[in-house]
Amino acid sequence: MNFYRSSIISQIIKYNRRLAKSIICEDDSQIITLTAFVNQCLWCHKRVSVSAILLTTDNKILVCNRRDSFLYSEIIRTRNMSRKKRLFLNYSNYLNKQERSILSSFFSLDPATIDNDRIDAIYPGGILKRGENVPECLSREIKEEVNIDNSFVFIDTRFFIHGIIEDTIINKFFEVIFFVGRISLTSDQIIDTFKSNHEIKDLIFLDPNSGNGLQYEIAKYALDTAKLKCYGHRGCYYESLKKLTEDD
């Protein structure tokens, strides 16, 4: 596990049975530790994101391409001008072309010439707003990011996966809770209704049986875990997200 003081992992371990062995997956900018638990008692801290790994009816995994790279968001967010410049000059290859152009003009600096166009991918989800529960948060985020109504989404709440994400570029840690789910739509139907927005530029669909990269590794761990027996769970097997929202 990452050397990070988690805000909720001690409570998760205390009240939820571990379902599968932890794994670590990483690339050139992130190290992610994943641990699956039987859903016996889960609540989410305000700084913990909730995300859904969703399969379409044509057996594709839905993934969102962020409009802004993680690095660009951090450079814009930080108030320390020296840190802004350092991140830009040292890691400009983790920006997309438009971001590099914008920041070059802003700082009047030219980093080393880079041709790549960075794309950061995520699963739909986000942080709970005040007064929201997990189903409400997922419903809102999936609608905002992907334009899918919660009546088309079904979530397996028998288990969840706790993730610690270390961003080695900006030197920060993040926590996320993943759920597995299904969408009663094909990938083509989802693309037809999707509208590019301020958070998500476009969508991609992964083959759950073959692939590479962090999003594929996360999905494979989640889908393999879904096949295990979740004895003692207090959730549901692919319950309608709309019904979960109404029940809570």
Curated annotation (Swiss-Prot):
Main localization (coarse)? host cell
Key word S-adenosyl-L-methionine present = no
Q: Which InterPro entries match?
A: NUDIX_hydrolase-like_dom_sf, NUDIX_hydrolase_CS, NUDIX_hydrolase_dom, Vaccinia_D10_decapping, Vaccinia_D10_N
Do you know which Gene3D superfamilies this protein is assigned to?
Nucleoside Triphosphate Pyrophosphohydrolase
Catalytic residues in the record: 141
Q: Where would I find the Nudix hydrolase domain in this sequence?
A: 45-227
What's this protein's name?
mRNA-decapping protein OPG122
